[in-house]
């Protein structure tokens, strides 16, 4: 029991998006909530997940558990990424570049949150072509998957 509590607390969570969605059914509208959550340990592990439920808290819990199942290890090099990455995912084009010490995270929206949770401290990032936060977060994860380790 105690080991499970310490294992649960080692990841930081950030809710990136909560949407109220509705579906037309014969009796009217079926309303539920969708949550996009990123989890990370700020030491190179990060993951995202989507959860849907009738209320907001259960949707967030589902998203957190899915994000923990989809963790990715990011190869960090001197608190930044090892090399430049360009990637196209659906409509989103993402560009991530390493930055010198002291620069900070120069990226917007969900890209910044995901990189912070991954433990990257100095990076420059730009998203082109999409403002959809779900697509942008998946594009960021795919770009981080493409990174190769540098010695």
Residue ranges, per PLM feature:
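Ribosome-associated RNA-binding proteins
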Residues: 1-151
């Amino acid at each position: 029991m105690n080991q499970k509590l310490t294992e649960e607390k080692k990841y930081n969570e950030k809710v990136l998006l909560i949407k109220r969605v509705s579906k037309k059914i014969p009796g009217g509208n079926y309303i539920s909530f969708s949550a996009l959550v990123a989890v990370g340990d700020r030491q190179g592990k990060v993951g995202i997940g989507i959860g849907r439920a009738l209320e907001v808290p259960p949707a967030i819990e589902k998203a957190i558990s899915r994000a923990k199942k989809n963790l990715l290890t990011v190869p960090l090099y001197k608190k930044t990424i090892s090399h430049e990455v360009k990637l196209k995912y659906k409509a989103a084009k993402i560009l991530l570049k390493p930055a010198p010490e002291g620069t900070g995270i120069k990226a917007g929206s969900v890209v910044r949150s995901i990189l912070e949770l991954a433990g990257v401290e100095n990076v420059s990032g730009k998203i082109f072509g999409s403002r959809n936060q779900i697509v942008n977060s998946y594009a960021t994860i795919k770009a981080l998957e493409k990174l190769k380790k540098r010695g």
